[in-house]
Curated annotation (Swiss-Prot):
Keywords noted in UniProt: Early protein, Host cytoplasm
Name assigned to this protein: Protein kil
UniProt source species: Escherichia phage Mu
Subcellular location: Host cytoplasm
Function: Expression of the kil gene induces dramatic morphological changes in the host cell, which becomes enlarged and predominantly spherical and possibly dies. These changes might involved a direct or indirect interaction with host actin-like protein MreB.
GO terms under cellular component: host cell cytoplasm
Reported induction: Expressed in the early phase of the viral replicative cycle. Expression of early genes is repressed by viral Repc (latency) and favored by viral Ner protein.
Name of the coding gene: kil
Length: 74
């Protein structure tokens, strides 16, 4: 868990330095997940579009990896 916290903290600092805001973080999974607003250009270049299904509603989200973390934005 300490490893996940370190990876997430490093990723969050990198994102904030580039103008992104972390809305949510999930650290208790195998790969930390950070949900952000305003993704930096460096992440957009390598992003993959996925479909998220929740309560019968499907929506498109974008995801990329950074410092061992999964970064998601809508």
């Amino acid at each position: 868990m300490a490893r996940n916290i370190k990876m997430a903290t490093d990723a969050q600092n990198w994102l904030q330095a580039r103008g992104s805001h972390v809305n949510e973080s999930y650290l208790g999974v195998a790969r930390p997940i950070l949900e952000i607003t305003y993704p930096p250009v460096e992440l957009v270049k390598n992003a993959v579009r996925i479909m998220e299904h929740k309560s019968g509603v499907a929506r498109s989200v974008w995801t990329a990896r950074l410092n061992g973390c999964q970064i998601i934005w809508r």
